């Protein structure tokens, strides 16, 4: 990115590789589109169903128990600590954390309640983190067991077993089931949401399926701030369903409930809204690139305007093509300076330039872009390339939860937090890091892989006229859009929902269900 020659080389190599990928894609597609298995729809009910669910739960427990021991009492990374520090208004070196919806308020309250329980019963932050890990493990294993049971219903025991082994052995799922973080909760609830969609698309539209759709959908939207996008995508994709009225009404109700419950939570807890910069990763990156590589194109008026939103003198220095957080942190947003009553905090929030003058920022962004289209395009590509380009870019600590060494988050509440077996966790990290660099195996840890597979599966589903499953295809598209709007390039954590969805789409592609 440092010179026109380098950019030209990068573009030519990208085009060449894209042509190669295109023909590879066509070859793979032509081969796999001819693959078809058949499956008989099973009706497992009563005690037999409960017993089978118990066996699946036990298998997951055995596969995931080593992670529970290694990570005991649980992995508290930056995001999890951030949420708890906000809930308990902890002091740090540059001010005070205050409750916001930056990380979903719903998960902040759940995790905070479990931490509080540990503090009350055992007077220990480690106990609180352990209680969260136990609860999240039980929740995740229960939900994934339900998903496998549903797969067995439609696709048989063998494919159910294979899917279970994938989820059981892929380290991201057990690791995040032991994390003080919203992501583990999202993984669990997404599996329940997938259960409801599989049942509905497969013709099982009884009251329990509709109820599960509504409950899991609402939880999905509350656990992640982008969850609403996923629900809307499924709603649009469900327009192709036959006898869709009840499904569309249910999904519309989910959207309504997410918005209403979210507002109630913010109002009742007196939490501040998410800072506006969270949704401005690409504009911030594009402007920062112009400041670094073509500052002469900016007028004095534009520089003055930018200086009201950012520390202008630092913009070029902190710019990172693949990571938007430095640009966000360089803003003039008064992090950890919102103190006092809710009225005082909200008044200070409303008086920030990114809130009261957001329109002016967006107009300035558009105006600067008119003279810097090339730099804007480069910034967009740099911010998103590794989601749609097959380069080994796993960077393990970018997607794996872990103990934080960041003194900003290690407040008085977390000063005594520690892993019981840090040496075992270090060995685990080292071994996973080795796996992310082994040929073929490393493909599992590259975001592009899951995008590529989703693309093939989606085309097979469309071309074989299985349009009742288009809502799941749209769900995958929404996940990719969220990836492209995220502040990191190739960050595998944003691909977790796609990793969960891809095996389901694979079954839909290649298995014909017989009643």
Where are these regions (language model features)?
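Extracytoplasmic catalytic/substrate-binding loops of multi-pass membrane glycan-assembly enzymes
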Residues: 71-85, 95-114, 122-127, 497
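Short helix- or helix-capping micro-motifs
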Residues: 60-63, 163-171, 217-221
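Membrane-proximal stem/loop segments at transmembrane-domain junctions that anchor or position
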Residues: 271-418
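Loop-to-helix entry region of an early transmembrane alpha helix in multi-pass inner-membrane enzymes
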Residues: 9-11, 101, 105-109, 119-145
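Transmembrane-helix signature of polytopic, membrane-embedded enzymes
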Residues: 53-55, 144-169, 187-188
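Membrane-interface anchor segments at the N-terminal boundary of transmembrane helices
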Residues: 127, 131, 368, 378-473
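Transmembrane-helix motifs of polytopic, lipid-linked glycan transferases
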Residues: 19, 23, 131-155, 192
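Short acidic/glycine- and proline-prone juxtamembrane loop motifs at membrane-interface regions
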Residues: 78, 175-185, 223
């Amino acid at each position: 990115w440092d010179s026109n020659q380098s950019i030209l080389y990068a573009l030519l190599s990208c085009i060449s590789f894209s042509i190669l990928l295109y023909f590879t894609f066509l070859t793979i597609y032509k081969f796999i589109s001819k693959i078809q298995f058949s499956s008989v729809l099973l009706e497992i009910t009563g005690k037999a169903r409960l017993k089978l669910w118990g066996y699946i739960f036990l298998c997951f427990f055995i596969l995931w128990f080593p992670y529970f021991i290694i990570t005991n009492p649980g992995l508290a990374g930056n995001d999890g600590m951030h949420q708890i520090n906000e809930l308990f208004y902890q002091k740090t070196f540059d001010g005070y954390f205050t409750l916001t919806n930056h990380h979903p308020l719903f998960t902040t309250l759940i995790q905070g309640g479990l931490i509080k329980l540990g503090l009350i019963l055992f007077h220990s932050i480690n106990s609180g983190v352990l209680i969260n890990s136990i609860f999240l493990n039980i929740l995740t294993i229960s939900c994934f067991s339900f998903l496998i049971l549903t797969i067995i219903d439609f696709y048989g025991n063998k494919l159910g077993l294979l899917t279970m082994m994938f989820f059981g052995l892929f380290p991201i799922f057990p690791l995040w089931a032991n994390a003080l973080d919203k992501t583990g909760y999202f993984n669990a609830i997404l599996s329940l949401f997938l259960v409801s969609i599989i049942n509905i698309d497969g013709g099982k539209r009884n009251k329990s399926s509709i109820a599960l759709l509504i409950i899991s959908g609402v939880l999905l939207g509350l656990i992640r701030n982008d969850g609403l996008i996923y629900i809307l995508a499924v709603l649009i994709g469900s327009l192709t369903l036959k006898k869709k009225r009840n499904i569309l009404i249910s999904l519309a109700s989910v959207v309504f409930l997410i918005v209403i419950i979210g507002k109630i939570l913010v109002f009742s807890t007196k939490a501040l809204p998410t800072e506006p910069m969270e949704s401005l990763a690409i504009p911030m990156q594009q402007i920062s690139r112009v400041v670094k590589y073509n500052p002469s194109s900016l007028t004095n008026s534009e520089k003055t305007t930018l200086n009201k939103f950012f520390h202008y003198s630092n913009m070029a220095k902190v710019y990172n093509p693949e990571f938007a957080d430095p640009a966000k942190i360089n803003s003039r947003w008064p992090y950890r300076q919102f103190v006092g009553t809710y009225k005082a905090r909200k008044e200070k929030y409303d008086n920030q330039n990114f809130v009261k003058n957001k329109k002016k920022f967006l107009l300035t962004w558009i105006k600067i872009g008119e003279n810097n289209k090339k730099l804007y395009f480069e910034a967009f590509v740099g911010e998103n390339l590794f989601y749609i380009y097959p380069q080994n870019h796993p960077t393990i600590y970018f997607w794996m939860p872990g103990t934080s060494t960041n003194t900003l988050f290690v407040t008085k509440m977390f000063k005594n937090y520690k892993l019981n077996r840090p040496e075992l966790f270090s060995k685990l990290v080292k071994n996973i890091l080795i796996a992310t660099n082994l040929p073929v195996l490393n493909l599992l840890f590259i975001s592009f892989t899951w995008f590529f597979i989703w693309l093939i599966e989606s085309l097979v589903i469309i071309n074989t006229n299985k349009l009742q499953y288009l809502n799941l295809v749209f769900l995958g598209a929404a996940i990719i859009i969220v990836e492209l709007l995220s502040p990191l390039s190739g960050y595998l954590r944003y691909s977790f929902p796609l990793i969960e969805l891809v095996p389901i789409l694979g079954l839909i592609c290649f298995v014909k269900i017989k009643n």
